Every structure is written in C-alpha cells, then in structure tokens.
C-alpha cells in the first residue's frame, strides 16, 4: 500500500484549517493509512445481493400540524434576554458584509 506522505497530511490539515506539529503529522499519517487499509478490506466484501439503503433502520417522523399560537407573556421572555429591541431579541452580528 502507498504510504501517505507528510506533504499530503499537511495539505489536508491546511484545508481543514488545522495547525499540526511534526509529531502530529506523523500520527495522522499513520491513522489515515489504517483507515485506508480498513476501507480496502471493506471493498473486498461481496455486496452484490444486498439492497441499497441509506440507514440501518427506517426513520419515521411523527409530526403534528403547525399551529400559530400567540404567547401572552412575550415581554416576560424578552426581559430574560441580554439585549432586546422593541419586541425582538437583539443578537450580535455574526456575518461580515
């Protein structure tokens, strides 16, 4: 199996915005090699007669109908907020223009 180079680990770390020292780069290279070896083992499994699925168990949502309800004590809730403006919560800006 082809070994994963330090440069490849550095590139992946850069893309993931991770700062790794040389020891961590070596550790991650070994871990990635083990993961790829495991994937190679999985590729050998015959799945020809296995039906495609997206999950192991079926997921069913039990939903209720959306109903608009006025809350009579909205001022009481707004008073709990660190900051408010009229009838709205005031939150810090998180998106730069």
Curated annotation (Swiss-Prot):
It catalyses: L-glutamyl-tRNA(Gln) + L-glutamine + ATP + H2O = L-glutaminyl-tRNA(Gln) + L-glutamate + ADP + phosphate + H(+); L-aspartyl-tRNA(Asn) + L-glutamine + ATP + H2O = L-asparaginyl-tRNA(Asn) + L-glutamate + ADP + phosphate + 2 H(+). GO terms for molecular function: asparaginyl-tRNA synthase (glutamine-hydrolyzing) activity; ATP binding; glutaminyl-tRNA synthase (glutamine-hydrolyzing) activity. Its EC number is 6.3.5.-. Keywords: ATP-binding, Ligase, Nucleotide-binding, Protein biosynthesis. SUPFAM superfamilies: Glu-tRNAGln amidotransferase C subunit (SSF141000). The keyword Metal-binding does not apply. One of its GO terms (biological process) is glutaminyl-tRNAGln biosynthesis via transamidation. Transmembrane segments: none annotated. It comes from the Bacteria. InterPro entries: Asp/Glu-ADT_sf_sub_c (IPR036113), GatC (IPR003837). It holds the Pfam family GatC. Belongs to the GatC family. Allows the formation of correctly charged Asn-tRNA(Asn) or Gln-tRNA(Gln) through the transamidation of misacylated Asp-tRNA(Asn) or Glu-tRNA(Gln) in organisms which lack either or both of asparaginyl-tRNA or glutaminyl-tRNA synthetases. The reaction takes place in the presence of glutamine and ATP through an activated phospho-Asp-tRNA(Asn) or phospho-Glu-tRNA(Gln). Heterotrimer of A, B and C subunits. This is Aspartyl/glutamyl-tRNA(Asn/Gln) amidotransferase subunit C. It comes from Prochlorococcus marinus (strain MIT 9515).
